């Protein structure tokens, strides 16, 4: 099938959250399966620093009383064609900024629709999050193009101002809706990035005021778990690590722990229980829980803690203060570093994700891949990826708690600390996690079945592509 991915992010070129990982990884696997997949995203001002882009556009289009240019390149490390939507409104060197995001991304979505109608006509437009929410509305009347809409985070639904309704051909009965709601109503298929999250968003607790609409469209709503790039995240070959290792050579992992302790100024003690966290410092990620229990945990145990990430100034300040009270045992790195994150995955004993909600989560899958035992709250994709350790039956891949309460999180963390003392059982726990399959191939098969369902094909039907290019309109 001819499939056009339309999104605001695509790793490794532009990434803020998990959407960038999906758009940067899934098309590569789908192309290997035989689909003709291409990506359409904004031409941000920082992209020329990361990829070679031709000076001349392949097509010039018009949308919302504006002229835009489309440039063609290739997603780095792949053969996936990448179309870049060029307009001065996307020239600044950040992805998200200012108060006009609704106008900019609706304009971008309109440009993608014009491109699909007039230059390269796909069979399916795969839209990602609110930035592309109007595309299913516009495509609803086109019998030749169907749409799939993926919810990466329902909490971000897209603003809507009255002036947009005058220039986007919005149906009168949708005036005042946000672009996420528009996509939910008009897309042929809707999916979230984990099965559990697909069920949770139909409830008031997680539905972000759209639970009624989501329940109404439940017949076309499903959940497909994200994957990770198992070649990129591979402890047996990761150059960021001091020592590579596999599930069968876990004893080599000790060198990474010592190297991490030395790098971050922690006491060098291979026997200490080292807990890591790589996260945005926002409430969604459970920072309020962590702040309430970390002092007590470090005082009660001989553990160490390392945090990597940036976010709300309040949480940054609180974490700095805790680190100052435990020199040599708590390291807070308020920055983004892909290399350091890999060293934390490869050197820490456990990895915490006490999220208030989590559509999918990728960090816990990377942690499992590296033998870093996850300690998570059972919500969203964390339910689908981490199973609770049962020491008697020797099952499970991590430690889990249910209620979003400090005591529950603290109790779970202490249980993991106690479990770490039983080295044989702990190594078996690490090995079970490292042998889990979170490859994108598994996810791509599920998306292939989703695409097939639109056309009434059996889920296992594999593509027989016959790509066509509609001549450019000049």
UniProtKB/Swiss-Prot annotation:
Keywords annotated in UniProt: Glycogen biosynthesis, Glycosyltransferase, Transferase
Pfam families: Glyco_transf_5 (PF08323), Glycos_transf_1 (PF00534)
SUPFAM superfamilies found in the cross-reference section: UDP-Glycosyltransferase/glycogen phosphorylase
GO molecular function annotations of the record: alpha-1,4-glucan glucosyltransferase (ADP-glucose donor) activity; alpha-1,4-glucan glucosyltransferase (UDP-glucose donor) activity
Pathway stated in the Swiss-Prot or TrEMBL entry: Glycan biosynthesis; glycogen biosynthesis
Catalytic reactions of this protein: [(1->4)-alpha-D-glucosyl](n) + ADP-alpha-D-glucose = [(1->4)-alpha-D-glucosyl](n+1) + ADP + H(+)
Protein EC: 2.4.1.21
InterPro entries according to UniProt: Glyco_trans_1, GS/SS, Starch_synth_cat_dom
Taxonomy, superkingdom: Bacteria
Sequence positions that bind ADP-alpha-D-glucose: 15
NCBIfam families linked to this entry: glgA, PRK00654.1-3
HAMAP family: Glycogen_synth (MF_00484)
UniProt protein name: Glycogen synthase
Species: Thermosynechococcus vestitus (strain NIES-2133 / IAM M-273 / BP-1)
Gene that encodes the chain: glgA
């Amino acid at each position: 099938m001819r499939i056009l991915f339309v999104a605001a992010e695509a790793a490794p070129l532009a990434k803020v959250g998990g959407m960038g990982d999906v758009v940067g990884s899934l098309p590569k696997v789908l192309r290997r399966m035989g689909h003709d997949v291409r990506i359409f995203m904004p031409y941000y001002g920082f992209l020329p620093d990361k990829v070679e882009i031709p000076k001349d556009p392949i097509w010039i289009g018009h949308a919302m009383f504006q002229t835009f240019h489309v440039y063609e390149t290739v997603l780095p490390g792949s053969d996936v064609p990448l179309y870049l939507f060029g307009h001065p409104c996307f020239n600044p060197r950040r992805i998200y900024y200012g108060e006009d995001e609704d106008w900019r991304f609706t304009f971008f979505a309109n440009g993608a629709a014009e491109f699909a109608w007039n230059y390269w006509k796909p069979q399916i437009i795969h839209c990602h999050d609110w930035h592309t929410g109007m595309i299913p509305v516009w495509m609803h009347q086109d019998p030749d193009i169907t749409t799939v809409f993926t919810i990466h985070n329902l909490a971000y639904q897209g603003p809507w101002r009255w002036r947009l309704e005058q220039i986007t051909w919005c149906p009168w009965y949708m005036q005042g809706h946000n672009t996420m709601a528009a996509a939910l109503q008009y897309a042929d298929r809707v999916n979230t990035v984990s099965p559990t999250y697909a069920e949770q968003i139909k409830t008031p607790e997680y539905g972000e005021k759209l639970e009624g609409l989501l329940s109404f469209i439940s017949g076309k709503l499903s959940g497909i778990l994200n994957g990770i790039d198992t070649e990129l995240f591979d402890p047996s070959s990761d150059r960021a690590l001091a020592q590579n290792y596999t599930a069968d050579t876990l004893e080599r992992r000790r060198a990474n722990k010592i190297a991490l302790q030395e790098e971050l100024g922690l006491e060098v003690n291979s026997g200490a229980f080292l807990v890591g966290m790589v996260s945005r410092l926002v409430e969604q990620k459970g920072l309020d829980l962590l702040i309430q229990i970390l002092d007590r945990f470090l005082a009660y145990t001989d553990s160490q803690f390392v945090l990597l990430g940036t976010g709300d100034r309040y949480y940054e300040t609180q974490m700095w203060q805790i680190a100052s009270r435990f020199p040599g045992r708590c390291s807070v790195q308020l920055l983004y570093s892909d290399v350091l994150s890999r060293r934390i995955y490869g050197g820490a004993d456990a990895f915490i994700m006490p999220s208030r909600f989590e559509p999918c989560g990728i960090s816990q899958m990377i942690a499992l891949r590296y033998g870093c035992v996850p300690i998570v709250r059972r919500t969203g994709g964390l339910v689908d990826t981490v199973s609770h350790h049962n020491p008697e039956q020797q099952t499970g891949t991590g430690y889990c708690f249910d209620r979003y309460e400090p005591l529950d999180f603290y109790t779970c963390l202490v249980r993991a600390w106690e479990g770490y003392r039983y080295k044989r059982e702990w190594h078996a726990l690490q090995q079970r996690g490292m042998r889990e399959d979170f490859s994108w191939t598994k996810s791509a098969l599920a998306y292939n079945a989703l695409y097939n369902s639109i056309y009434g094909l059996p889920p296992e039907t594999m593509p027989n592509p016959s790509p066509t290019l509609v001549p450019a309109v000049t």
